[in-house]
Amino acid sequence: MKDLVVVVPDSNTEQTLYGLLERHKALQIRRIEYRILVHPERDPGVLQRGASLLAEIDALNAFRYALLIFDREGCGKEMLTSSELEQQVQQQLDASGWQGRSAVVVIDPELESWVFATSPHVVDVFAGGDAEVFQRVVESFPKTPLGKPQKPMEAVKKLLRQKAIVRASALYKELASRVSLKGCIDPAFQRLCAILRSWFPQD
């Protein structure tokens, strides 16, 4: 039996998780065996049918824990808060036999909000090391209370366009493999780390 199965909405989230989960020491967890599934229906699919996807592969008997991750933006139920969405999906998981062995993390508004951590690696990966362009692009967007762009995906796309960098999933994995985890204060990211630490404490 493997430790963890994760259902995600797209390859960018998939590669971010690959980059993160290999850094077990930085996450303060033991090394784990895991599998990541990309739902073909993206965010709405994880929201509405993530538990069904786990049932299709008989994950209950193959993995100790299950984690569902998706963006609030684009999930189709943006009128609900992240907490309300997490509770809704958790009820589906509990009804499917995952009670006490599962969790849901909803990123608000979207994965790209994790990109804007306080780290020079962010500038290196998404702006080709050009701190001036990075700052100019970030300042061109309205900010959240945490000082991040309110539309992080648009900010990422604008950065990559200005530096002629192709937007690829490999960028997300590279950043997740390098960035200081302490620099990411996004609530969903902090929740993810806390869940992993509770399930897989260091030996």
Residues of each region from the PLM?
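C-terminal accessory helical subdomains adjacent to catalytic cores in phosphodiester-
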Residues: 1-3, 14-40, 50-203
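Conserved SAM-binding loop
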Residues: 6
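Helix N-cap/beta->alpha junction signal
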Residues: 9-10
